[in-house]
Amino acid sequence: MLEKLFGFDASKHKVKTEVMAGITTFLTMAYMLAVNPNIFSSLASKGMDTNAVFTSTALAAIVGTLLMAFYAKKPFGLAPAMGLNAFFVFTVCLTMGYSWQFALTAILIEGFLFVLLTVTKVRTLIVDAIPATLKRAIGAGIGLFIAFIGLKNAGIIVENSATYVTIGDMTHGSALLGVIGIVLTSVLVIRRVPGSLLIGILGTALIGIPMNITSFNGIVDTPPSIAPIFCQFEFHNILTIDMVIVVFSFLFIDMFDTMGTLVGVCTKAGMMRPDGRIPGLNKAFMADAVATMAGACLGSSTTTTYVESAAGVAQGGRTGLTAFSTAVCFVVALFFAPLFLSIPAAATTPVLVIVGLFMLSPVKDIDLNNYAEAIPAFITIVMMPLTYSISDGILCGMISYVAINALCGNWRKLNVTICVLAVLFVMKYIFI
């Protein structure tokens, strides 16, 4: 039955490993249950219920992750996208002046367009057009990106007006807890302790109690109603230029963030074939697209596949059972919100850093002596953490790949799809 439901093969997979991987993925994603409502609190004065946002965030994660589990049978968690939620609140609503109902309508339309692109296999066509070298670079770039996120969340890396970033004060507070957690989790991983990443998160959170970083604000609570934001759409502005721009922006960022995440994590999980293709990728895209539409109905910003899924993959998750376990955790989180929200961001830092290391492994398969391949790969890798964007890393990498190989006369390496995409990406940077 497990094989039919989740693609589980008893000769290759273990139930315990898949479940532990799912829990690990959840714990690395759980921060958004606190962050997302906090970001949307800026719209409270415009009538968007912040408490309802918490419930919609969890429900969107549940629906999206279950779709990934049962339909795509992949070990990935989905939830409202961090970054796109800020675009929703601060750009569409607060800067452009549109209502949150307008923004939800844009997300619904974006999700519908995603479904069309997936049904016509346009998204799969784009992925297949990306050279294997860049796919490996995408995985490595995401590794650096999530490690950077982890270090930033703990305050180990902080802002600096002169150098943009610098090292934080690691003698106390979250930064110290993050450092302790990295050492603790590293030892567990090196000693091959089963469930080392999950134990690392929980152990770091417990250490944070006497440091006054981890604080428990209760255990059980009734989930707030989503009625105030459920299916709140505004269709009378859908033909405006602003709606087109907003929909395109959501679509563009979500498409390449999701594509980068799926390609990177699938590569790390050993799901990529020697020819660079990933079996079942179109189903994963469809799950992501439908989840975005469902999320809009629930009152959530764009729902997407989370890069933190790499934590579960690193823990051994390979099937839909991992995603199902993650979804179950989100169901539990609805009723144990105060408890789950007690896990500080610094407690997830060790996992994000170590998983970042794990995801660097595809670099060894990049031919660093072939500069026509190595330079675009390096640009892809380094631009993700430096621009704080997976999609920008992919775009810069693909533009440089086409430009370098075209000017060097390596036309046989290039296909029509990647050349067209490179031109579109250049136009995007010029005009948008």
Show which residues each predicted segment covers.
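Hydrophobic, aromatic-rich alpha-helical transmembrane segments
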Residues: 11-22, 46, 50, 54, ...
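Membrane-embedded alpha-helical modules
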Residues: 96-210, 214, 324-432
